[in-house]
């Protein structure tokens, strides 16, 4: 018992130390930097200021933030529309086939997402495989311009983040109470009524979790908007990257990062509140 207790203490101390060293302290440094002044010589001057946060109210940066939220929302809804039928199909397959498809769903994670975006860029370019194929079929007369548009950014975000939507949806659909669905049909409910009144409420925790897993990173994937959207389709992540790497305005970049973190934190809070209400509703439906 003593050895087990000592081992547990070592594990707890290790985890806490790791969180403090790699999460708490870096975030504390970013928060501190956001209240300092830019200096051309040393990047940061130890002079307190609130100007970095005031600059975020500038219409230019505020518009980028709203644009990021809009793009993330569209990408999330697109992933939900594409991911739900796939997750449903996956959950209804024989158990012998499911592991293979789940494995194929995870395989893309073995390749760096940046490399995959480069591949997608080649595929969708004016002289890419998609346009060449459509021209060969005679569907189009001239190549379609897809790259460097908002649609290209959405396609890139969906391409990268779709598995994050499918996984929680699959988990929720797989746990559906089959006798409950059969009872609804026996009582005369149509397939659409069963789907809207039974299936959607029961899988809502997976829907909310999937939307959160997609929407949060979608706002910060700056390389997707860089490669697929160009300079006219910036996300808030691009602003942070430019401030740190190009302009070297670390305090303003830190302030932008903290603002994005606060927005994500509010989304997590909404998710926590919604998940509690949904779990209660699901238990009521099951009862």
UniProtKB/Swiss-Prot annotation:
Compartment(s): Cell inner membrane
Q: Name one Pfam family in it.
A: BPD_transp_1
- Periplasmic compartment residues: 32-70, 121-145, 219-251
Q: Where is the ABC transmembrane type-1 domain?
A: 65-271
Tell me, which GO biological process terms does this entry list? Answer: transmembrane transport
Report the NCBIfam families cross-referenced here. PRK09497.1
Q: Tell me the function of this protein.
A: Required for the activity of the bacterial periplasmic transport system of putrescine and spermidine.
Name the record gives this protein: Spermidine/putrescine transport system permease protein PotB
Give the species this sequence originates from.
Salmonella typhimurium (strain LT2 / SGSC1412 / ATCC 700720)
